[in-house]
A protein has these predicted regions:
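Conserved beta-strand/loop elements of the cytosolic catalytic core of P-type E1-E2 ATPases, chiefly
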Residues: 51-62, 77-79, 99-100, 112-118
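Acidic, Mg2+-coordinating phosphoryl-transfer loop and its flanking beta/alpha structural elements
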Residues: 74, 78-79, 132-173
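Metal-dependent phosphoesterase signature
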Residues: 30-60
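Short, charged, surface-exposed secondary-structure boundary motifs
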Residues: 105-112, 163-170, 181-185
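Active-site neighborhood of HAD-like aspartate-dependent phosphohydrolases
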Residues: 1-36
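Short acidic-hydrophobic, aromatic-tinged amphipathic segments that line or gate anion-handling sites
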Residues: 98, 169-178
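Substrate-recognition "cap/lid" segment bordering the active-site pocket of phosphatases
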Residues: 83-134
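Substrate-recognition element of Asp-dependent hydrolases with the DxDx(T/V) motif
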Residues: 61-89, 96-100
C-alpha cells in the first residue's frame, strides 16, 4: 500500500507529515505527532480522503495479489485506518484487512483506536491459534514483531537501516522476488 501520509504531505506542502515508522518506530508517538500537525494546520478527514482517492496501489501489487491468492490466503495487516483504506482495498480486490480506526468529530481527526497492543504480532498469533502457517512480509520497524512471530518472514523494499538491523529476514525488492521467496517456503 502506498504511504497515505506521504501523499498528504506532498499535497499540503507539509514536509513534517512525511515521517513514517521508518523514522519514528513508536507508532503511538508517530500518530500523536501527526495529529498535532493536522490540528495545527486544520487538515480535515475530507482533505485526506481526497488525496487517498488519487492513490494507486504500488506498481505490481494487483498482479502480485492475483498470483499469490492462488497459493495463499491473504490478509493485509496494516497500521493504517479503515477510514483511509477503502479506496485502495477496492483497487486491490478487497483482500482481508486488519487495521485500526480513527476518531472523527466534525470532519476533524481527533484520535485513533489501536485494535490492540502489538496488533501485527497478535494477528499472527491468532492465525497460529487457528492452526495456520503464516508467511509475512513487511518493510519497516513496525513489522518486525509480525515477522518474528510468523513461520517465515520477509522484508519487502525495506530501507537499508531497517534490513541491516534484522538480517535474518530475507530482503526482497520486487514482487517477483517476494513471490518466489514465499513459494520456496511452501
Amino acid at each position: 500500500m502506498p504511504e497515505v501520509w506521504q501523499a498528504v504531505a506532498q499535497s499540503t506542502g507539509l514536509e513534517s507529515l512525511k515521517k513514517t515508522t521508518r523514522d519514528i518506530p513508536d507508532y503511538d508517538e508517530l500518530m500523536k505527532y501527526r495529529l498535532a500537525i493536522l490540528d495545527e494546520h486544520n487538515i480535515t478527514l475530507p482533505i485526506i480522503e481526497a488525496e487517498i482517492a488519487k492513490l494507486k496501489p504500488l506498481d505490481g501489487a494487483v498482479e502480485f495479489l492475483a498470483e499469490a491468492v492462488k497459493h495463499f490466503q491473504i490478509a493485509i495487516i496494516s497500521d493504517t485506518f479503515y477510514e483511509f483504506a477503502g479506496p485502495l482495498m477496492e483497487k486491490l480486490g478487497y483482500p482481508m484487512l486488519l487495521c485500526h480506526t480513527l476518531e472523527v468529530k466534525e470532519d476533524k481527526i481527533v484520535g485513533y483506536n489501536i485494535r490492540q497492543p502489538d496488533p501485527k504480532r497478535c494477528s499472527v498469533k491468532a492465525f497460529h491459534d487457528l492452526k495456520y502457517r503464516v508467511f509475512a512480509a513487511g518493510d519497516s520497524f513496525n513489522d518486525v514483531s509480525m515477522l518474528e512471530e510468523a513461520d517465515h518472514g520477509f522484508f519487502f523494499s525495506a530501507p537499508q537501516n531497517v534490513s541491516e538491523l534484522y538480517p535474518q529476514y530475507p530482503l526482497t525488492r520486487t514482487y517477483d522476488e517476494l513471490l518466489a521467496g514465499l513459494l520456496a517456503k511452501l
